[in-house]
């Protein structure tokens, strides 16, 4: 109560921020006459002046008013477009590393030019991040003339660019690209073998367009670069045949309950598991197929791979639906992005799921993949010194932006008041009744000349509605993942009189729907249009625009509520741009996924008690509130999942930083001999301690074991026993020093025989190759660890703490093994000449090229992350080892009670 009164008196945080920024806008506006009087050359020269002032110690904040005034004036001269005051505020919010919530049609693309120009003055480069290639190219081409007029270079970063082109693009002052491509470039750079093969430079300032889509919706989908693993396509096919024989278990309190089924299905959590009955049934099927021994069970260690295949196949059949989660095109399964409705060619689900779906659909099964590198968007974008974003809908997720990314959200006022009429939801009993009502609404709008945009949640629903419209003989366009090649054209005409457009989810987002059609798109179709032709097109558009306004503007129909209120708001936001008339309404049914899974039974019971007849709808604020409460629950659950994913990934991220920093260091220096010498000292001291324990009696010394180990692992044939026999004063410390000195001496002789530069190159090559191999295995071990860590909860242990502890032990083991392997290889190898190094370098490059050719860029399935005490599906990533590698300081698994390094670790 008190906080509400205080807010009324002093204003909200948002109000206070806007008041402060309006004062700076006033300063910029006062500069306008001065900048209008400048000649073009004088305006262009401002960039050189600003850069010079930065070098002399002025800050970007000092330059901001003049820099923004420069961009506004250039835009007026080139495009005839003057930045509104609210766009100036938006630009300042972005420059302050905050999120600007700007409604659809308020000119986010033009707003971004302001902070991009200002921050590009530093020479460090600015990245403008978009959700797809089309928007990256469009925005780059739209703003290229403006930036180049002011002396800035503009680049585009899209998939499949040659490395040299990509490297050149990263040198641009302002670079437009997709979130995926920036992330994958980072991973690829950290797999490069030479410094000159890397394309990125420092990550200074990023402006993310549709920031909610990238930092919220896609936060659960890690970017993964993977290479091919072993071929097991036949096994997927054989197991796929078994799955349709399984029966789902009904809820015990449901009318259909027929006893224990073979698997459970949790639609809310998007999980499925075999029941005990199902496990026994599957085991019998596998035995009948000859895939399992008679006395075996699914959970015996030898059958872990079979269990992995069964779980993947079960998920493919039960959780993943054709034309909703994926489409089949050209004998390939192509993922459909659940957030945008777009297809993602080249992307593959990990952990065998994609192969299981391919087997289900009867298309060619491609090889499984093994993770070579991965990172989440959360951790990638936190690498930037400055991060900001724009979207039409961020306020509902403001808490998440602040808690995970440290980004405040500022709601920017519209340039003109919003006049859209958002009508209440209509709820029907069945989907058929709902679709009938939607058809009637579309008919009525079409007859009065009002354009309609219908939002659906899946390709399947969009095609169902399209067929119903065809039956009703209503002309319409479909905008979904199957037809996004014509996307821009369909969106350009979606605002024309009586146009009916069906859009899957938010396909077409990023392109404004202009009432009366897009006259600029019409002009673009002409070759060298004359001023008269342009004028004629504009006049025709003005007439069409006024006709549509009279009919009520764009009408939005939502066919289902989404899990997130934000996505519903995005759909509504397509209407009412820049103060235009518009309206929106959602049509729901009790058969919709959200209503069925999350909305309480009260709504359904209320409708039944009212004795509603077929075709009748209920419209009441209580119903709308119940639905919004259901959405809040889902949003809260999804936030918890994303937060948890980040907590687990932060552990891997700390390790990733260490490994990538080590790689950087290796690639940036020519001589790593000091590092090698330090490692040799550590390794030999550790080895010595295993066989001759500190401060121990000579009777406890294993001289023979030490001699053998030095000979086999380090090619050192030392007469240690003879030394001891001939010198009674050769104690433990002296003996250790003598062995280490001998090792250094042998290596020095090797250096003299092959040449210093040859050996330096060879050391670097061996270190890089060994590090990459161990890191790949470590990622597989971490995946394996994370998938079973939730079981620690049953032992009254905190899974997160256990994960941190064990992953740290794994990482310590990696660093120890790296030292040991590198020193061992360098000690044993015989480098004859420079050609040996070059041959190794060439082989390594060929291997890298082969991996690059075959590697898949994946989005790991979002739903198979873990929470603390609840199992996700038992999906086992392709493993390098069958078991977790035993750490050198752990107890030996043989049962001796000794440390592994002092027992079987010696072997």
From Swiss-Prot:
Zn(2+) binds at residues 892, 894, 903-904. It is found in: Cell inner membrane; Cytoplasm. GO terms for biological process: intracellular protein transmembrane transport; protein import; protein targeting; protein transport by the Sec complex. It is a peripheral membrane protein. Pfam families: P-loop_SecA (PF21090), SEC-C (PF02810), SecA_DEAD (PF07517), SecA_PP_bind (PF01043), SecA_SW (PF07516). Its EC number is 7.4.2.8. Its cofactor is Zn(2+). Transmembrane segments: none annotated. May bind 1 zinc ion per subunit. It catalyses: ATP + H2O + cellular proteinSide 1 = ADP + phosphate + cellular proteinSide 2. PANTHER family: CHLOROPLAST PROTEIN-TRANSPORTING ATPASE, SECA INNER MEMBRANE COMPONENT OF SEC PROTEIN SECRETION SYSTEM. Monomer and homodimer. Part of the essential Sec protein translocation apparatus which comprises SecA, SecYEG and auxiliary proteins SecDF-YajC and YidC. Part of the Sec protein translocase complex. Interacts with the SecYEG preprotein conducting channel. Has a central role in coupling the hydrolysis of ATP to the transfer of proteins into and across the cell membrane, serving both as a receptor for the preprotein-SecB complex and as an ATP-driven molecular motor driving the stepwise translocation of polypeptide chains across the membrane. This is Protein translocase subunit SecA. It comes from Aliivibrio salmonicida (strain LFI1238). The gene is secA.
